[in-house]
Amino acid sequence: MQFNKRIDANQLDMKEQVVDIRRVTKVVKGGRNFRFAALVVVGDENGHVGVGTGKAMEIPDAIRKGIQAAKKNLLLVPTVGTTVPHEVIGHFGAGNVLIMPAKEGTGIIAGGPVRAVLELAGIKDVRAKSLGTNNSRNMVSATMDGLRQLKRAEDVAKLRGKSVEELLG
C-alpha cells in the first residue's frame, strides 16, 4: 500500500534525464529578463521515479535545480514482473496518457516524454498512448498521475477485505 511517506533519494542510485529546456522571458521596464526552465525526470530504474522543474539564469543551474526538485517528490511505482498491474489513464491539464500492460518482450511503446518517465521508473514492457495535448510538461505530469493511480492486487484485496484469489476470480 502506498502511503505519503518521503522516499530518501540519497539511498538510491538515481539516473536523470532532461526532458525539456525552455527559455522564458519576463518583460520589465528596462527590457527583457531571460531565464531557462528545465524539466527533469529522475529514477533508479527499479520502481522509483520523480519529476521536477528548475529555473535559473544558466542552463546547468536550471537542470541542477530540476534534479533537486525531482528527488523531493519521488514516487514508488507498483509493477507486476516487467509491466504495470493494470490499465490506467493519467490526466493533467489538457493532456491524458493511457498506460496499458504488455507481454514480456514487448518493450516500451510510448512517445518521447512519456517514454522517459516509464524507462526511469524501471518498467520494461508497457504500451502508452498520449491523448490531447502534446506539451511535454503536461505529458510528463499526466504520466506521473497515471503511475500514482496504479495499485497492486494485494492492496486492492486488502481494501475490500477479500483474498487475492477471490478478487482475481
From Swiss-Prot:
It comes from the Bacteria. Pfam families: Ribosomal_S5, Ribosomal_S5_C. One of its GO terms (molecular function) is rRNA binding. Residues 14-77 form the S5 DRBM domain. Gene3D superfamilies: 3.30.160.20, 3.30.230.10. GO terms for biological process: translation. GO terms for cellular component: small ribosomal subunit. Keywords: Ribonucleoprotein, Ribosomal protein, RNA-binding, rRNA-binding. With S4 and S12 plays an important role in translational accuracy. Located at the back of the 30S subunit body where it stabilizes the conformation of the head with respect to the body. Belongs to the universal ribosomal protein uS5 family. Part of the 30S ribosomal subunit. Contacts proteins S4 and S8. The N-terminal domain interacts with the head of the 30S subunit; the C-terminal domain interacts with the body and contacts protein S4. The interaction surface between S4 and S5 is involved in control of translational fidelity. This is Small ribosomal subunit protein uS5. It comes from Alkaliphilus metalliredigens (strain QYMF). The lineage of its organism: Bacteria, Bacillati, Bacillota, Clostridia, Peptostreptococcales.
